[in-house]
A protein has these predicted regions:
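Structural signal for interior beta-strand "rungs" in well-ordered beta-sheet cores
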Residues: 120-231
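Terminal amphipathic alpha-helical/low-complexity segments used for targeting or macromolecular assembly
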Residues: 1-115
Length: 232
C-alpha cells in the first residue's frame, strides 16, 4: 500500500509538470503577443491552477469512464470482458480522449483540447468535438465515421452506431457573410436513445428520451420520446 501511494504521488507530480508545460503553451498561443515578465508569471500561475483542478477531477473522470466501459461491454455480445473493451475498442480511445479534452475546455484551456480529440479522430475515425456535452454510460459500437458536433448535448445511456452524424444545418451569417460563432446548432439527444448506423441528425433539434433512430435516415425535426423512426 505504501509503495502504491509512493508511485501514485511520483506519477502525479510528473503529470503536473507535463500539464503545466502544455497548458502554458496553449495559453501563450492564444495570446499571440509579446509578454512582459509579469504577464508570464500570471500565465504560469494560471497554468498551475488549471493543472491542479484537472488532476483533482481525475477520480471522477475515471468513474465516468468506467460507466462508458460498462455500457460498451453490456451492449456487445462479442466482448469477452471489460479488459478487452478497454484495450481493443477504438470507441473507448475516442471517448477517453474526449472526456480529457472536455474537462480541459471547461477549465478554459485553449487549443490543447482540440488537439487531443483530433489525435483520437486520426487514430479511430471517430470525431467528437471537445465542446460536446455527453452523459454517462455512453457507447459507440464499431464507431468509424461517427461525428459529434461542438454544441451537441447527449444524455445518459445513449448508444450510437458507426457513421452517425450529429451535425449542424446551414450556419447563420453576420453582416460580412461569415458564420456566426458560438450559437447552439447541433442536436440534443436525451437519455436512453439508440441511433443506428449512418443516421444523420442535423440542427438544434431534440431526440426524445428512449427514441430509436433507424439506419440511413436524415432527421431535421424533433423526435418524440419513445418514438421509433425507421425507413419503410
Amino acid at each position: 500500500k505504501e509503495n502504491l501511494l509512493y508511485h501514485t504521488g511520483i506519477n502525479t507530480e510528473k503529470l503536473f509538470e507535463v500539464l503545466v508545460k502544455q497548458i502554458s503553451a496553449g495559453l501563450l498561443f492564444q495570446k499571440n503577443t509579446d509578454h512582459t515578465d509579469s504577464d508570464l508569471k500570471r500565465l504560469q500561475e494560471s497554468a498551475e491552477q488549471k493543472a491542479i483542478d484537472f488532476i483533482t477531477f481525475l477520480p471522477e473522470m475515471r468513474r465516468i469512464l468506467s460507466t462508458d466501459v460498462t455500457a460498451m461491454y453490456n451492449g456487445d455480445p462479442a466482448a469477452q470482458n471489460k479488459a478487452e473493451v478497454i484495450l481493443c475498442y477504438p470507441a473507448i480511445r475516442a471517448i477517453c480522449n474526449y472526456r480529457i479534452a472536455h474537462k480541459l475546455l471547461e477549465l478554459d484551456v485553449p487549443l490543447i483540447p482540440r488537439i487531443i480529440t483530433e489525435m483520437a479522430h486520426s487514430e479511430t475515425g471517430i470525431d467528437i468535438h471537445p465542446g460536446a456535452v455527453i452523459g454517462e454510460y455512453f457507447a459507440i459500437d464499431h464507431g468509424t465515421g461517427v461525428v459529434i458536433g461542438a454544441t451537441s448535448v447527449i444524455g445518459n445511456r445513449v448508444k450510437l452506431y458507426q457513421g452517425v452524424t450529429l451535425g449542424a444545418r446551414s450556419f447563420p451569417l453576420d453582416e460580412n457573410n461569415n458564420p456566426i460563432k458560438g450559437i447552439a446548432r447541433h442536436p440534443i439527444i436525451e437519455d436512453d436513445v439508440i441511433i443506428y448506423s449512418n443516421a444523420t441528425i442535423l440542427g438544434r433539434i431534440t431526440i426524445g428520451k428512449g427514441a430509436v433512430i433507424g439506419g440511413n435516415i436524415w432527421v431535421t425535426e424533433n423526435v418524440a420520446p419513445g418514438e421509433r423512426l425507421v425507413q419503410a
